[in-house]
Amino acid sequence: MKFSIAAAVLALASAVVAHPGAGYVSTPEKEANFQQNFQKFVTACGNGNQVSCCNTETKKVGAPLTAGGLIPILDNINLEDFSLLKGCSKVDVAAVIGVQDLLNSNCKTQVSCCKVGDTNQVGLVNANVDLKCAAQNII
């Protein structure tokens, strides 16, 4: 897997905005601000990656969890806010108008930056999740 988890998490952390609460009311100013932040997220996601909507959070990874030497790259990453996801589908970033309402109604879990292409898992233990997605809330 050539996807740099640390780079993706760093890029996503720079584009994070708060998720609107139940009493959230959209205004033209809020929509424009969201569109600007969403475009920053798309840019931070980078080439060879795509913005995806992931509707199933398989496991919330916490800071006490360690890879136990099985996955050395994860030993040096703060996993407190990292999630394993499945059920991810591409978000069409060309249609940014009303994207906040689209994401709020269709993305039940998180908007993520995902590596384009198949995730090949090789080894004794394989997870039934999209390991190619770095998940971080942006809405």
Swiss-Prot record:
Q: What does the record give under GO molecular function?
A: structural constituent of cell wall
The cysteines covalently paired via disulfide bonds are C45-C113, C53-C107, C54-C88, C114-C133
Any idea which UniProt keywords this protein has?
Cell wall, Disulfide bond, Secreted, Signal, Virulence
Signal peptide coordinates: 1-18
Q: What happens when the gene is disrupted?
A: Leads to a 'wettable' phenotype with drops of water attaching to the mycelium, whereas water drops off the wild-type colonies. Conidia show a strongly reduced tendency to float at the water-air interface of conidial suspensions. Triggers an increased activation of human neutrophil granulocytes and dendritic cells, characterized by an increased release of the immune mediators interleukin-6 (IL-6), IL-8, IL-10, and tumor necrosis factor alpha (TNF-alpha).
SMART domains xref list: HYDRO
Q: What is its main location?
A: secreted
Q: Name one GO cellular component term.
A: extracellular region
Subcellular compartments: Secreted; Secreted, Cell wall
- Supply the InterPro entries for this chain: Hydrophobin, Hydrophobin_CS
Q: Name one Pfam family in it.
A: Hydrophobin
Judging by the UniProt lineage, the source's domain of life is Eukaryota
> Which family is it part of?
Belongs to the fungal hydrophobin family.
- Quaternary structure (record): Self-assembles to form functional amyloid fibrils called rodlets. Self-assembly into fibrillar rodlets occurs spontaneously at hydrophobic:hydrophilic interfaces and the rodlets further associate laterally to form amphipathic monolayers.
According to its UniProt entry, the function of this protein is described as: Aerial growth, conidiation, and dispersal of filamentous fungi in the environment rely upon a capability of their secreting small amphipathic proteins called hydrophobins (HPBs) with low sequence identity. Class I can self-assemble into an outermost layer of rodlet bundles on aerial cell surfaces, conferring cellular hydrophobicity that supports fungal growth, development and dispersal; whereas Class II form highly ordered films at water-air interfaces through intermolecular interactions but contribute nothing to the rodlet structure.
Q: What is this protein called?
A: Class I hydrophobin A
Q: Which organism is it from?
A: Arthroderma benhamiae (strain ATCC MYA-4681 / CBS 112371)
